[in-house]
Amino acid sequence: MSNTYKMSANTFRSSILSGIAVGIAGWGYLACRFKGLEILGAVLFSFGLLTVVNYKLKLYTGTAGFVALRKEDGSNRFFRAIRELLFILLGNIVGCMLVALLLRCQSLPLGWKEAQVILEGRLALGPLKAGALAIGCGFIMTTVVTFARQGKPLALLFGVPLFIYCGFPHCLADAFYYMAAPFRTFTSHHIGDILLLYPCLVIGNFIGCNLYRILNIKED
């Protein structure tokens, strides 16, 4: 077994576990919204990012602002970085899907309606506006992860509720919400609308995660 294969397998497993952490955090948030405790839910959502940071898991929005875009010799590796991020994103989505399937095992539809409301709200915004708002989430994510890597995890408890209350979409949280929504939601909206919306959130998060690099001439 080659080292490249082992690294890819480890990365994918890590990204799946990261998606599971985000999915469980999203589940808690939906449950709190269901009970009228949205503020508590926003704080509990921090569990996902705290898990990712402390276990050094691969999360798309926790990696996009730090992945090397250039090699040590200064040559461009942008497209390779994008492939790495999409690989991580795929694993994250798989993890979110596993939790969404588990959520459907409940006897009561706890959080299903709340997930539907979030999905319909994103669709009402449209892909361009939702994608633009996702930039804010990416910026917050890179900021709080930077603080956490410096031994200041308290920033996570502020940053996560902040992007939730600002209405900034997080592409992995949204992936969980969409898969947790009632199946009938997908009969009333064209799947194409969702497939157009989601990449805009991913791109918006990527731009936001890299705002520090975009606006600063100095390389990492």
Task: Describe these PLM feature segments.
Residues 1-220:
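Alpha-helical transmembrane segments and their helix-helix packing motifs
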